[in-house]
Every structure is written in C-alpha cells, then in structure tokens.
C-alpha cells in the first residue's frame, strides 16, 4: 500500500475481499523483527489498496459488527480493540503467529479473557500451527464472550472448531455496565 509493506488481516465475504486491516503494534524484541520489515497501521487510518478498503476498519454484517486485528495488537493495554469496540465492534477476531514457549498458552488465555471482559466484546483468537524458519507455533485458539470462555480449541493440530455466541448478550452487557459506558462516551 503506497509503496509500504504491511502485515494485514483480510476480511473476505461473499467471495470478495471486503477490506484490509494493517497491524498496528509491530514487535522488535526477542525472535520478532517485524518493525524492521513492515510498516505499522495507525489509528483512524483510512484508504484504499487496489480498490479494496484499507486501514482502521470495522465491518457490519447481518449477524453483527466485526473488527479484525493481527497478533500483537491484542497484547498491549492501549490496543486497537479498545477503539474498535467503542466504535461498535461486537466481535473481535485476532489472527496470530505467536511462537511456542513454555507457559505462553496460559499467559495468552489470561490476557485474552481480560481483554474480552474489559472491552465488553466477543473475542475469537486463532494461532498459527506448525514450524517455520526454526520456530514452532502451537496453534490452538479461544473464543471468549465478555470475559467468559466459550471455546478452547486444541493446540498442536490443524482443524476447525465452532461455537455459538449471542452478540445480543454482548450489547445487553455493554448497556448494563455503567463503567464501560462512561469510559467510551
């Protein structure tokens, strides 16, 4: 996009790419060197890439409002999830490439359940599985609705998992939570 290289989540529906959402938080620590290769997305960034919407986007579907994000974007307290849920996103989908380390699965679980509760949303998280350039990715995934575990997908294997969530419940819990309402107005 505009001569720069981004890591993006692509939203595909009805056989068409509906939008590209660039990763905002680029790690440059430990085994991660993304900041050396990629440009980061910015809050409220909007544009097009080859006729496809590009930037800080949320997507409205018949079932609800979806906000995609990429990996590290969920790991900071000032994450894009906060801005996007305050803009109406009910479902946040985080696609991740987090390498395996002992204890990381529990850390992910605790951090993501906190994010889903803090931001009064349903959060679907999926991690890469397999080996790549000497790194090992343990896969797995979670779905949390407003801080409650709805799905714990197995690690170390490819596959599909499904669960049902009630996005009306998410909206009802938001309206009942006076702290959340005050924080975002």
Model-predicted regions and their roles:
Residues 1-185:
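Enzyme catalytic cores with a strong preference for nitrogen-chemistry domains
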